[in-house]
């Protein structure tokens, strides 16, 4: 199949065009969609396994229902590439998905009326769907179809919604896309229930045996054997006496082969107009159609550009990539596990992304993956700390939002020394608005007792991790998913213990003070070099700790610096800028301040270069704004690639 040989897909400009195809043509369409996704993601990167697994189900849903009149609500939203291709987005935007000028990797209402919500977090679809369905008058109600993965049922929000379903709610069809995975392998009792009850080989085997036996009964056998759903349910009841979904008021159909579109369509047609809510259980295979993704769906959950070329080049000498901050975290965590025999690690379904597999393998009895349950992860960590054990709660910045009260009530109010390792702090680039880790300092700064810090380099990161085991209060170490600078302006022992609230001066100057957080310290040092061309000498300081703030050092520095710049990859509301500006106001310093941060808006997706330039956080833009703001310009010169 060549890049121009997607004849069926090319015909589809909207779901109405899909309905013009015969059912017999749909398997061929599924293959074309898979080819298109693999071809594009080979160039751009993106979510691969989940999208390959949901192709036939998406085709069947659009074939039976009528979007956007009927409302599709995808949980998480990263598995919507087939949905985008069937709703008029098989264009250049898809060619650049998750990249500059490309489509979002999640549902996005600004792209299409077929996308109802911005998405990115798990467990929200059922609540959103219920809110729409239960408040729309019956006479004007269209179908509402939430599409959830099995991992969503380990999320408390989904169970809360399940508990509120009304049994007389019509035109409400819940799709359970069951691939027995989220990103990493599912965990917990809910996963075990699905595995035992819905996937048990004996269930299908015994069902078929009973049907064959009944068919042999004279006169009534054929009639009895036709009642397959009732028979199937009876068999399932042998393994689970109280069927889960029916106890919550949902009729249940399934499990159904999610890759047999010819069977999916008549089943969806039969449940479409039932006067009560129903759950259709569809079994799919993550990574379907690509052997390496199907064999290792977690590895191919999200792929980088040129992943196919990397696979074919395995025989060549490997170019070892620079270790990222998560890589350093995973390595150091194993060292800490050796040093502290009581150290425990908790994560909400992010063991692979956060590089926790090494610790998990070495210390399985001290590792806990609690599933998509961020609130529980935090409060569970509080319990571990209360029992006298050191504990690190490893969590993405964007997912920590979901556990705000748990951090406040169960950790900070108790003054428990839980260590939050906040991964993916800063811009998320391709993942976009739902995943940017740029808000955590805003709410953590408001928490009494909380220590907040960010490393600029490998060695400082290791120092903070080792030091945090000695702190007696809750702490948050935030770090991005980028290569961790190996060199450091100040050399140091990785085992050096840091005290909270101590900043470091990286370079001395006289004319302007630059305070930069994290790896932006290196950008600040480069800006210092640019300013030297104008005869301007800058002092560069890494605060390291946002809370407690080093009031002593900054009071001393402001006695000799009247011009100050702050630089951070965080929202302008609540981060370094807010902390420093409040410090200046509190102690009544008379200084001219220029803050560089992320503006108070929702940022889209894109490359690092495009995003930082769009908000003026790239080196060239910052240098030129500094020259203008402080009137440092002398003669016309070129700074970087910008004429000033």
UniProtKB/Swiss-Prot annotation:
Its EC number is 2.2.1.7. It comes from the Bacteria. Transmembrane segments: none annotated. The keyword Protein transport does not apply. PANTHER family: 1-D-DEOXYXYLULOSE 5-PHOSPHATE SYNTHASE-RELATED, 1-DEOXY-D-XYLULOSE-5-PHOSPHATE SYNTHASE, CHLOROPLASTIC. Catalyzes the acyloin condensation reaction between C atoms 2 and 3 of pyruvate and glyceraldehyde 3-phosphate to yield 1-deoxy-D-xylulose-5-phosphate (DXP). This is 1-deoxy-D-xylulose-5-phosphate synthase. It comes from Chlamydia pneumoniae.
């Amino acid at each position: 199949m060549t890049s121009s040989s997607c004849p069926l897909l090319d015909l589809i400009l909207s779901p109405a065009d899909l309905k013009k195809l015969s059912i017999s043509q749909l398997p061929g369409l599924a293959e074309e969609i898979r080819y298109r996704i693999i071809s594009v993601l080979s160039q751009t990167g993106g979510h691969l396994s989940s999208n390959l697994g949901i192709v036939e189900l998406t085709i069947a849903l659009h074939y039976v229902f009528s979007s956007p009149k009927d409302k599709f609500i995808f949980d998480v939203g990263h598995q919507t590439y087939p949905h985008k291709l069937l709703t008029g987005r098989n264009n250049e935007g898809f060619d650049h998905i998750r990249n500059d000028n490309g489509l979002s990797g999640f549902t996005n209402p600004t792209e299409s009326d077929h996308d109802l919500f911005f998405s990115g977090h798990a467990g929200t679809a059922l609540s959103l769907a219920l809110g729409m369905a239960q408040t729309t008058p019956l006479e004007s109600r269209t179908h509402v179809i939430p599409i959830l993965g099995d991992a969503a049922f380990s999320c408390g929000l989904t169970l809360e919604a399940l508990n509120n379903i009304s049994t007389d709610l019509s035109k409400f069809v819940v799709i359970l896309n069951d691939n027995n995975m989220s990103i990493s392998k599912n965990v917990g009792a809910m996963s075990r229930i699905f595995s035992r009850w819905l996937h048990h080989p004996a269930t299908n085997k015994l069902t078929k045996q009973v049907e064959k036996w009944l068919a042999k009964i004279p006169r009534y056998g054929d009639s009895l054997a036709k009642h397959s759903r009732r028979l199937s349910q009876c068999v399932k009841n042998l393994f689970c006496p109280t069927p889960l979904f029916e106890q919550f008021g949902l009729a249940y159909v399934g499990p159904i082969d999610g890759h047999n579109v010819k069977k999916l369509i008549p089943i969806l047609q039969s449940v479409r107009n039932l006067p009560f809510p129903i759950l259709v259980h569809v079994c799919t295979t993550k990574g379907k159609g690509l052997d390496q993704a199907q064999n290792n769906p977690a590895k191919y959950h999200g792929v980088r550009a040129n992943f196919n070329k990397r696979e074919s080049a395995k025989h060549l000498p490997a170019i070892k990539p620079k270790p990222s901050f998560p890589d350093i975290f995973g390595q150091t965590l194993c060292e800490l596990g050796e040093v502290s025999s009581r150290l425990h690690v908790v994560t909400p379904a992010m063991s692979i992304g956060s590089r926790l597999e090494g610790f998990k393998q070495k210390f399985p009895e001290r590792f806990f993956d609690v599933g998509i349950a961020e609130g529980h992860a935090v409060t569970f960590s509080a319990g571990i700390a209360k029992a006298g054990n050191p504990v690190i709660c490893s969590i993405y910045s964007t997912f920590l939002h979901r556990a705000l009260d748990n951090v406040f009530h169960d950790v900070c109010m108790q003054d428990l020394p839980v260590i939050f390792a906040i991964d993916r702090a800063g811009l998320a680039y391709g993942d976009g608005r739902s995943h940017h880790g740029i808000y955590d300092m805003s709410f953590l700064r408001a928490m009494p007792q909380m220590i907040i810090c960010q490393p600029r380099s490998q060695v400082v990161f290791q120092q903070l991790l080792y030091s945090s085991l000695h702190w007696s209060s809750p702490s948050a170490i935030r770090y991005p998913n980028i290569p961790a600078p190996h060199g450091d302006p100040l050399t140091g022992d990785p085992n050096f213990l840091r005290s909270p609230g101590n900043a470091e001066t990286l370079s001395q100057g006289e004319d302007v003070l630059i305070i930069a957080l994290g790896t932006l310290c290196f950008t600040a040092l480069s800006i210092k070099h640019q300013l030297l061309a104008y005869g301007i000498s800058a002092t560069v300081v890494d605060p390291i700790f946002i809370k407690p703030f080093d009031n002593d050092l900054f009071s001393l520095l402001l006695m000799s610096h009247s011009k100050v710049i702050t630089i951070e990859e965080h929202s302008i509301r609540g981060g370094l800028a807010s902390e420093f500006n409040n410090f200046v106001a509190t102690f009544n310093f008379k200084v001219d301040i220029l803050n560089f941060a992320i503006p108070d808006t929702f940022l889209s997706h894109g490359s690092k270069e495009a995003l930082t330039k769009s908000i003026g956080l790239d080196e060239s833009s910052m240098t030129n704004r500094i020259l203008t703001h402080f009137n440092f310009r002398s003669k016309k010169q070129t700074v970087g690639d910008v004429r000033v």
